[in-house]
């Protein structure tokens, strides 16, 4: 049988839109500010300097960027924090209990264009996509090959990513299938491309045919899951670990799961 992701299982990441000061906003704000200064997205140092109260820290969420997010693996250490305010923070009084964050955001009032200004993110998204049970983070624009990363901790991402969260199939199994050469080939021919770059958007994600796990393929599906565990373990110890041999094994198992012929495999491998 085939399995397709559903609309409710796929979401784009956060749209700030003012994560930090760019040239244009610097011109508006003037000399007391600097390029790259954090607005809705803060460095550890910027967070320290705000001397936040305990309840204010609850609004800060760990945001992960592409240097943390590799194929299969997300490095757990985050360099940035997002002031995670949903549309209820459109209310001008919503920040009254968070005086230091309020003071911080008020400085940038002139340049904040969010639909939920003064304090809300433009699109905060449904928070369940960033927390709780395991998810897959997909980089929207990929050079060379698609990248799908398994994550099982709180991991907030911006709109340069999509997040897949489903309870209907084993998430490690799904990660292996999505990262396979077969699916890269499918995306190249049936998905969206910009030149040689993969454009991993919601539409292609919802159309990828995933073979479901059944009694016939359970054993090799388990092999895939174990291989993903091995990759994650290797990357955990050294994020630059070479996992190509493991990924090659995954490619070969995926060909079996999809019952491909030798000829079809040759086409995909470009031989």
For every predicted segment, state its role.
Residues 1-217:
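Polybasic, glycine- and aromatic-enriched phosphate-binding surface used to engage nucleic acids
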Residues 59, 100-108, 210-271:
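Non-catalytic DNA-recognition/assembly elements of restriction-modification systems
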């Amino acid at each position: 049988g085939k399995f397709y992701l559903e609309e409710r299982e796929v979401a784009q990441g956060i749209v700030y839109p003012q994560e930090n000061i760019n040239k244009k906003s610097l011109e508006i704000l003037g000399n007391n500010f600097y390029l790259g200064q954090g607005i809705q997205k803060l460095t550890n140092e910027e967070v320290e300097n705000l001397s936040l109260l305990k309840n204010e820290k609850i609004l800060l969420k760990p945001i992960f960027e592409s240097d943390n997010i590799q194929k299969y693996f997300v490095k757990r250490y985050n360099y940035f924090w997002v002031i995670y305010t949903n549309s209820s923070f459109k209310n001008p009084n919503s920040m009254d209990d968070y005086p230091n964050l309020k003071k911080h955001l008020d400085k940038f009032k002139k340049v904040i264009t969010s639909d939920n200004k003064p304090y809300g993110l433009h699109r905060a998204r449904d928070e369940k996509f960033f927390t709780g049970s395991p998810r897959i983070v997909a980089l929207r624009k990929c050079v060379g090959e698609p990248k799908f990363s398994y994550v099982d901790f709180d991991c907030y991402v911006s709109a340069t990513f999509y997040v897949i969260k489903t309870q209907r199939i084993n998430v490690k199994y799904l990660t292996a299938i999505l990262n396979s050469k077969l699916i890269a080939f499918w995306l190249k021919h049936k998905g969206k491309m910009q030149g040689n770059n993969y454009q991993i958007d919601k539409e292609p994600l919802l159309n990828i045919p995933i073979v479901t796990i059944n009694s016939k393929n359970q054993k090799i599906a388990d092999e895939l899951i174990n291989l993903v565990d091995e990759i994650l373990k290797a990357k955990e110890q050294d994020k630059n670990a070479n996992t190509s041999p493991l990924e090659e094994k995954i490619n070969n198992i995926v060909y079996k799961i999809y019952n491909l012929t030798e000829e079809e495999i040759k086409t995909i491998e470009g031989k």
